[in-house]
Swiss-Prot record:
EC number: 4.2.1.20
Highest taxon of source: Bacteria
Protein name (record): Tryptophan synthase beta chain
Subunit structure, interactors included: Tetramer of two alpha and two beta chains.
Gene3D superfamilies, sorted: 3.40.50.1100
Function as written in the Swiss-Prot or TrEMBL entry: The beta subunit is responsible for the synthesis of L-tryptophan from indole and L-serine.
Lineage: Bacteria, Bacillati, Bacillota, Bacilli, Bacillales
Residues with PTM N6-(pyridoxal phosphate)lysine: 92
One annotated GO molecular function: tryptophan synthase activity
Length: 402
């Protein structure tokens, strides 16, 4: 079966993607697409990107054999792709560097970004400081409450954080505000979008910058095991760490599992199952799977993890779901939290709650596989930012009512 791995001339993967933006934004989108295509074929740009990934972020990140976790679960050998060890503690910095270098190349002096968990905001603020650019970060009021530490980090790095109380005050609302701001300041400002979403060329750019994850996994597993893994597992919100993990393996005989956040359960209205329970629609400039009611109104997404409560999933993921190339599965709040607690005790690594959704699925997958088989799971970020949430969960006696 032929898999489409690049957008068509209108910016679509199959029927997903496109450029659903107001006319006023089209010149900026066209300018960005052209600049990105030029940069992509420029060896100097690639060199510069790789220089900062190595010297500033600390790449490559290890691919660690999780010996104790493998023993505990029985079955497949489990390797961890350690994106938690990047500077700033998550995968978000890979994309922030790429886009900031592109913005500089385009002569932009200012950046605007949205953030949910605050990790993309922190990565953007870090890079804005490094490259001496102004940054405004829009963040939902609800997320600000959950992620006080990251708000302080962004401000310490010199960014201006603007609270968004529209809607339910989460990531989706922050994206709306960031897009509006960009429309009005497009001459000197680049919109540093943090996930594989939005109008073309954003999903492709973000995927390309994050593909360093999957490319490293490929060379690392070949040198450690002499072959490709049998399965890759990553959590999915908008979908940037997962698309970066999966993309280099799309044409290979490797099973791919994207783990969505089932929140309080798929039988409730409190989940973020864009593929599991959603249907195609348009949001934030792109056609993709969305959680919506019968009238096509976007429903509010819920997850205990601030980075996964987005009501959509990027267009490339939407396409891979339809053609059956990636299996989209899910983990509830409780399943993710229990996996986080187990994994921390067994491996001495406290993952972000987002990443714990992926681990929760590994706990189901590994025991049903042969011990000669190999799973690689992407630990998209570290859990420092989630201490308050984890503490509350444990104080409430663990399992929340579902």
């Amino acid at each position: 079966m032929k898999i489409q791995t690049e957008v068509d001339e209108l910016g679509f993967f199959g029927e997903y993607g496109g450029q659903y933006v107001p006319e006023t934004l089209m010149p900026a989108i066209i300018e960005l697409k052209k600049a990105y295509e030029d940069a992509k074929s420029d060896t100097h740009f690639k060199k510069e990107f790789n220089y900062y990934l190595s010297e500033y972020v600390g790449r490559e990140t290890p691919l660690t054999f999780a010996e104790s976790y493998t023993k505990l679960l029985g079955g497949a050998k489990i390797y961890l792709k350690r994106e938690d060890l990047n500077h700033t503690g998550a995968h978000k910095i890979n994309n922030a560097i790429g886009q900031a270098l592109l913005a500089k190349r385009m002569g932009k002096t200012k950046l605007v970004a949205e953030t949910g968990a605050g990790q993309h905001g922190v990565a953007s603020a870090t890079i804005a400081a490094l490259f001496d650019m102004d940054l405004i970060v829009f963040m939902g009021s609800e997320d600000i409450k959950r992620q006080q530490l990251n708000v302080f980090r962004m401000e310490l790095l010199g960014a201006k954080v603007v609270s968004v109380s529209d809607g339910q005050g989460t990531l989706s609302d922050a994206v709306n505000k960031a897009l509006q701001y960009w429309v009005n300041h497009v001459e000197d400002t680049h919109y540093l979008l943090g996930s594989a979403l939005g109008p073309d060329p954003f999903p492709t750019m973000v995927r390309d910058f994050q593909s360093v994850i999957g490319n490293e996994i490929k060379s690392q597993i070949l040198s450690k095991e002499g072959r490709l893994p049998d399965a890759l597992v990553a959590c999915v919100g908008g979908g940037s760490n997962s698309i970066g993990t999966f993309y280099p393996f799309i044409q290979d005989d490797v099973k791919l599992y994207g783990v969505e956040a089932a929140g309080k359960g798929s039988h409730t209205h409190n989940h973020a199952l864009a593929i599991g329970k959603g249907k195609p629609g348009v949001l934030h400039g792109s056609k993709m799977y969305l959680i919506q009611n019968d009238d096509g109104q976007i429903e509010l997404a819920h997850s205990i993890s601030a980075g996964l409560d987005y009501p959509g999933i990027g267009p490339e993921h939407s396409y891979y779901n339809d053609i059956g190339r990636v299996s989209y599965v899910s983990a509830t709040d409780n399943e993710a939290m229990e996996a986080l607690i187990t994994f921390s005790k067994v491996e001495g690594i406290i993952p972000a709650i987002e990443s714990a959704h992926a681990l929760s699925y590994v706990e189901k997958l590994a025991p049903n596989m042969d011990e000669k088989e190999i799973i690689v799971v992407t630990i998209s970020g570290r859990g420092d930012k989630d201490m308050e949430t984890i503490k509350q969960y444990k104080e409430n006696g663990g399992e929340q009512n579902e």
